[in-house]
Amino acid sequence: MNHIKTILIDLFLLAVLGLHAQELQVKVNVNHSQIQTTDASVFENLQQTIEQFMNDRQWTDLQFQSVERIQCSLNLTVTKYVREDHHFECTALIQANRPVYNAAYTSTLYNNRDASFNFDFQQFDQLNFMEENIDNQLTALLAYYALLIIGIDLDSFAPMGGSDILQRCMFLVNNAQNLGFPGWKAFEDSRNRFAFINDYLDEGMKPFRQLQYDYYRKGLDEMANNAERGRTEISTALETHLTQAHSDKPLSLLPQIWTNYKKDELTAIYKGKGTQKEKERIYELLMGINASQNSSWEMIKQ
C-alpha cells in the first residue's frame, strides 16, 4: 500500500512540475489614452490575449519551476488604431528581471524600447504560432521577445548558455522580413529588432555575452555571501568584457543600451564602496561608453 502511495505521489509531482514548465511570467499593460473611443474592450481583450499567449506557451524544452519563471513586463502605448482594418501602431517598452541569488532583489536583465510595435489584431482573435511558418506579425513580435529574453537569461547562468534559443530568435527575424512590417530588416534602423539580435550574436560581441555571465553569476549572485568579492568580479567583468566589446565593435549600441538600464544598479554597487582607484577606473570606463549618463557615473565617485 505504501508503495502504491509513493508511486501516486511521484506521479502527482510530475504532473505539477509539468504544469510549471513555462518560462515566462509576463504582465502586459495597454495604454490607449491617445485613442479617442467609447469602447475600450478591444484593448482589454488585446492585453488578455497577449498575456495568455506569452505565459501559457512553453517556448523551449527546458523545465522551469514556478519560482524560476522569468518576470517580464510589456507596456504598449497605442499611438494609432484603425478600427476598420484592425490595425495597431504602438511603441513598446519591454523589461525582464532576473533574481539575485540569496537576495530579496531582482536585477534588470533586459530593458529596451521598440518604436515600431505595429500589428493587426481583431477582437477575440486566437493567436496561433508556428515557428517554421511566420505568417502573423503580432505572434512574430511576441515570439521574438520571448526567445530573446529566455536566451539572455540563459546567458546569465552559463557562458553562452542561450546560444540555441538566440539562434531561433535570429531565424525568426529572417523569416519575419516577408511580413511587410517595420523592424525586421537590416539597415532599416540601427536600433530595430534585427539590429539587436544580429549584434548580440556577432562574433565580435562574444565579450558582451560573456559579460552577462560574469556580471550576474560571478558578481551579483556572489554579493550576498561576500559583497567585496562580488563587486571585484563585477569590476573585472566591466573592465575586461564590456571594454573589449565596445572596442571590438564601437558602432554597436548594445553596450550603450546595457549601461542605460544598468546605471542605477551600477551606481548602487560602487557609491560609497570600494577604493577610490577602483571607482575612478569604473567611472572612466562607463563615461567612455555612455557619456549621456554622466550624472549617474559621477555618483560612483562618491
Region locations from a protein language model:
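Acidic/His-rich structured neighborhood in mature extracellular/periplasmic domains
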Residues: 84-198
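Start-of-domain marker
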Residues: 22-89, 100-102
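Second-shell loop/turn segments in exported
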Residues: 33-40, 128-136, 248
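Bacterial Sec-dependent N-terminal signal peptides
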Residues: 1-24
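Sec-exported extracytoplasmic/periplasmic mature domains
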Residues: 51-59, 151-155, 267, 271
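Flexible, glycine-rich surface segments
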Residues: 161-251
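A cross-kingdom marker for long, charged
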Residues: 29, 213-302
